[in-house]
Amino acid sequence: MKKLISLLLAVMMLASMASFAAAEEEKTLVFISQAAWKDQMQVLCDRYYEETGVKIVLENYSFNDMINTIEVKIGTGSTDYDILFVDVPLVSSYARRGMLADLSPYFTEEDRAKLVTAAVEASTYEGKLYASPMANSSQVLYYNTKLLEDAGIDLAELEAYSTDNRITYERLVEIAEQALKVLDPDGTQGMIGFDFQQVDRVYQMNQLPNSMGGVQVSEDGYSLDGVLNTEPWKKALTWYQEQVKKGICSRGITASELPNYFYSGKLIFMLGTTEMVANFVKKDMTTYAYTASPAFKGYEDKVATATGSWHVGVSGYSQNTEEAAKFVKWITCTDEATEMFYDLRGMIPTYVPLLDKLANDENTVGWMKLAITESKTTAYPRALTPAFNEYSSVINSVWSDTRNGEDVEETIEWAIEEYAAQTIKYKK
């Protein structure tokens, strides 16, 4: 009897220990995620749980609420969260304040080589990797085929352009002028020849000086002296202002309003993100085509295209850094997860093996193939600075003031002084 009791006790102890071990092994990680992707992210997290036993709990927020939650929770040192989506221009700011964990120990050089170079650069602060890219954005030049045909423009020329043979901004303006003379000769129809989807915004407008070899900000991220007061920026700002004065580009229309002009047949050419295609489908718009982003004449080898989207990082205050980093690596840097996300969401990948696969697939749509080429060759990240909010505010004003006819030299001088004043606090 004693032997039986001893045996039962031993079995119970082993069962208890096994249960305890299982509880110890099962991890739960909390992810500050965006509501727009909640369904797709849940599918990915469920797959990760099936494979690893690690449960990912999503807390989904709208864009503004997510940014605020990150500032309020992670910014004050909360240990309740492990993983977060990061709007890429904020990586440096978060890293500087200790809000992101260094992922360098978890991503080898071989791993990083599998990610788009510009995206890795945008996630690197002081030589360390603080987030890993999950999705990307790119630019194409859209044009309204019906308007151009009505204006007597031969579409064959536009159809012949590519990433190897780009239309120049100068030629683009010539075609736009020619079309406007037919479509809106006296300027009473409210037609626009060419414009940027995100007019007045640093994300897209900086593509102009960048495409002449201009840089975004000083190496330390805190100065615009030696940046704005250089030939690329002066030429780009002057060129843009001239197009506004001539009536080729618009004035007084906001970035949120401008795409509507393309949908409604009031805008002939629009430089926009690849995500615009989904909007065209929703609007039942069929009279459009696209080509590669333009180059400035004489600067064909300097083409730079706006890029950057969502990256994934680990909270600097997570109590599960290693497990969280493993998840980040899985979701952003493996064949399985990146292909799943692409199939679910259709966004431009940042995982090079998948980009190569799509580029060689005859079923990949044309705009995606353009985006793949730009991502690998011309993508140029936004300013890498902890002071990005201050930077974007100042540079947005530069573009807006230039558009409204302010003196370019005076605008540049103001911006240099204003940014210097706003970044003093970062140097203390």
Segments predicted by a language model, with ranges:
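Short, solvent-exposed loop/beta-turn-alpha elements that line the ligand-binding surface or hinge
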Residues: 104-115, 158-166, 187, 192-194, ...
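Extracytoplasmic/periplasmic solute-binding protein
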Residues: 126-134, 139, 165-225
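Conserved N-terminal structural module of periplasmic/extracytoplasmic solute-binding proteins
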Residues: 2, 6-9, 18-96, 106-112, ...
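Long, aromatic- and glycine/proline-rich binding clefts that accommodate carbohydrate-like moieties
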Residues: 291-292, 342-399, 426
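Hinge/lid segment of periplasmic solute-binding proteins
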Residues: 86-140, 149, 170-171, 187-190, ...
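Immediate post-signal peptide segment of exported/extracytoplasmic ligand-binding proteins
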Residues: 22-30, 49-54, 124-127, 179-190
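Extracytoplasmic/periplasmic substrate-recognition and gating elements
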Residues: 27, 51, 55, 246-248, ...
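Glycine-centered hinge/linker elements that transmit conformational signals in sensory
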Residues: 173-177, 220-253
